[in-house]
Amino acid sequence: MDSTALKVALGCIAIRLAVNSLFPSLQQQLDQSVEFSTPVTSFRSLQEGIYLLRNNIQVYNHGVVHHPPILIFFLSLFNSDRLISLIYALIDGLIAYQLTEVTKAFKNLKLKVWLPGLLYAVNPLTLLSCISRSSIIFTNFAISSSLYCILAEGNVLLSSVMISISGYLSVYPILLLIPLLGMLKSWRQRILSAIVSILSLLILLLFSYSILGSQSWSFLTQVYGSIITFEKVFPNLGLWWYFFIEMFDTFIPFFKAVFNIFIAVFITPFTLRYHKQPFYAFILCIGWIVLTKPYPSLGDAGFFFSFLPFFTPLFGYLRYPIISALLFLHAIVLAPIFYHLWVVLGSGNSNFFYAISLVYALAIASILVDLNWAMLRIEYDNGIPNFKLKVTQI
């Protein structure tokens, strides 16, 4: 085990445990924040599912729990609040470790191996997401594990299994199977990876059924159907909620289908266009899902930002990094203020909060556009950076 990666992981764990100890009430405050908690990732909802499962009560008949059965079953094994905090810290530490190990696969970048892992460890967004005990951390862990398995260990099968787990936990990450297949060298590996992913997902669903026993397949509707159909129109940092508050009921099913197609439709073009740089296509796909998913949180953005150091050789091509950074800072500072004005004080309205969520989306979108431009420029320059050359976008 590499000492650098281990130090980063231990530092990440220590920071999270220290914050938990110093600010014991912070978890509940963050869990009530729409920036870090959504109806499908909330720890309150997870606790409700754990309670119902332990008491042999039907978990998914009350419209409150939207977490997958295996996750609920896993966390129900631990009774201590401190132990659960430790589990979340360990998961975050493992993500930091994996990011550090993945960096070693890109020695030609001349990137400090500890930088992505350290950025993840000290990033306030990932730190607070972990403290809030949002279940998004498990999805992020599955995604980082998939990259770690294929890039650091060369294990295609395990990487495919981890992508299936991420899809099992949050639906949309299963789309990352497409750029994952683009990272494989032969069609034989791609077909095998796709088969393993599908079989793994089926096994996870069957195991979920066995956990619930007589409750049959009701979890499919509450866990996955509620996300795809955006069942709970709840304010968040995403683009969906305001549209479906204002929209006539007649048009809602059609536009929900359109929004879902919109998430999926750009994954394959990213993969095909950047087939020579499949890892970067994978990162862009992560960013696209973060931008377009129905229930995003700042934990999603923090995870995506941890991969930005891999674009270091392209930073000279970025056209408006300062604008993107200021947009993002503007959004994360004003989002809780505008939500408080709207919901708590009643001196604002939903337009306040949705306006700032649009700024947040614009920040993520501008980062994605800038990264795409940078990748096209390095390709135009035949892999040799030429920052002085001025090229006009047509």
Swiss-Prot record:
Keywords: Cell cycle, Cell division, Endoplasmic reticulum, GPI-anchor biosynthesis, Membrane, Transmembrane, Transmembrane helix
Region (May be involved in recognition of long-chain fatty acids in GPI): 235-255
Cellular compartment(s): Endoplasmic reticulum membrane
InterPro entries to which the protein is assigned, alphabetical: PIG-U (IPR009600)
GO CC aspect terms: endoplasmic reticulum; endoplasmic reticulum membrane; GPI-anchor transamidase complex
Keyword Endoplasmic reticulum assigned: yes
Keyword Cell cycle on entry: yes
Domain of life (superkingdom): Eukaryota
Transmembrane parts of this sequence: 136-156, 161-181, 191-211, 225-245, 251-271, 298-318, 325-345, 352-372
Pfam families xref list: PIG-U
Segments on the Lumenal face: 157-160, 212-224, 272-297, 346-351
Family listed: Belongs to the PIGU family.
The protein, known as: GPI transamidase component GAB1
Native source species: Saccharomyces cerevisiae (strain ATCC 204508 / S288c)
